[in-house]
């Protein structure tokens, strides 16, 4: 649902030996639209004490985020769906706002929500392993129109009743064990540069479980180095030359420290 029907998510046994035996794999042959126009949790929704980030295909109907000024994609539909990382349904004012922004009546709007502390929440966040690679590529100013296909995988994090711990585990699954393979048009040099810059190890904040990093910044999420939000390992294939480039590595010790 988060991918707008343009991607597939599967759960399968881990590749090789690992303490965490099941991994999510995400594939899309239209990854820019699937990941950035739909799955990316970029729509901030709030009312009084309620706050959540919205993802899902309804975002491309509303086009409220600056990101859409850079995406050559528009959508129209009589129904809309928004996915929230939240433990409760949105209040009526948020429902009304989203319905109006999407151009649908409230009875044609569906919200799907799951708390981060749940298994469903773990699946939703870890399932963004391909999306974070696309978002990082965008932040690096790589031409999005050159990304033609993508595959990514990461371990399913065990849920935890504490929000910060649960959030940390879902992020660590990607930061320390996520692997993304992008297929791109353009020169081999551009593909190599992208592979080298994509991995999370390029971040100044790399090297500790995410929950520790979050606490070190006193819960101020936006003070964390944005380049941390990337897969641990990147593989980029230049489809016009057939060359493949790799960078980064999985860190099982940090993953074990996070997952417990």
Curated annotation (Swiss-Prot):
It catalyses: 5,10-methenyl-5,6,7,8-tetrahydromethanopterin + H2O = N(5)-formyl-5,6,7,8-tetrahydromethanopterin + H(+). The keyword Transit peptide does not apply. GO terms for molecular function: methenyltetrahydromethanopterin cyclohydrolase activity. It is an enzyme of class 3 (hydrolase). It is found in: Cytoplasm. Pathway: One-carbon metabolism; formaldehyde degradation; formate from formaldehyde (H(4)MPT route): step 3/5. Keywords: Cytoplasm, Hydrolase, One-carbon metabolism. Signal peptide: none annotated. It holds the Pfam family MCH. Its main location: cytoplasm. GO terms for cellular component: cytoplasm. It comes from the Bacteria. SUPFAM superfamilies: Methenyltetrahydromethanopterin cyclohydrolase. The keyword Hydrolase applies. Its EC number is 3.5.4.27. Transmembrane segments: none annotated. GO terms for biological process: formaldehyde catabolic process; one-carbon metabolic process. Catalyzes the hydrolysis of methenyl-H(4)MPT(+) to 5-formyl-H(4)MPT. Belongs to the MCH family. This is Methenyltetrahydromethanopterin cyclohydrolase. It comes from Methylosinus trichosporium. The gene is mch.
